[in-house]
Structure formats: structure tokens, C-alpha cells
Amino acid sequence: MLEINYKPSFICLYNEAEVSLQEEIKEKIALFRNKNNHKSLKVHKLHGPLKDRYSFSVNYKIRIVFRYLSKNEVSLLAVGDHDLYK
């Protein structure tokens, strides 16, 4: 099971989301924590300026950006649409 840390930037963006989206985010984080290779999350490595970060899908539009701190620990950095990648 992954240990998850939440950066202040992630918490701020999460708190700005609608309550229904917050619930969806919580569900996907639970899936990610218990099975980080879950196919429906579409976990993938980012490129370019974000090359040391990864992302997984909350839904068709929303992504969570994270980075590995160790094999069993990640830090969630941001949540939002594809503008996160800019």
C-alpha cells in the first residue's frame, strides 16, 4: 500500500473543486493507494518540464499530478484539467 502525502498546492486545488468532484477524487486516490497500476487510472510518466512527475486520471477531464518520493511513498502535487501540464 502506498503512503500518500498531500502538498499544499494539491489541497488548495482540491478545496476549490465542487463537492461531487471531491468525492470522485477521493475514490480515485483510494484506488491508487491500494493498486497503483489500476488500468482505469491510466497512470503515466510526464515529459518535458514535468519529466520527474507522473499523472493519473480522475475522469476524462481531470488528472492528479504526483511524484514518487520512494518505492512506497508519493506526493500528490496538483489536481485539475490538462492545463496542469502547461
Protein language model regions, located:
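Residue-level detector of intrinsically disordered/flexible regions characterized by low predicted structural confidence
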Residues: 9, 30, 44-47, 63-65
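A short, surface-exposed loop/turn module that caps and links secondary-structure elements
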Residues: 31-56
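Enriched for short, Lys/Arg-rich terminal
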Residues: 1-4, 8, 12, 23, ...
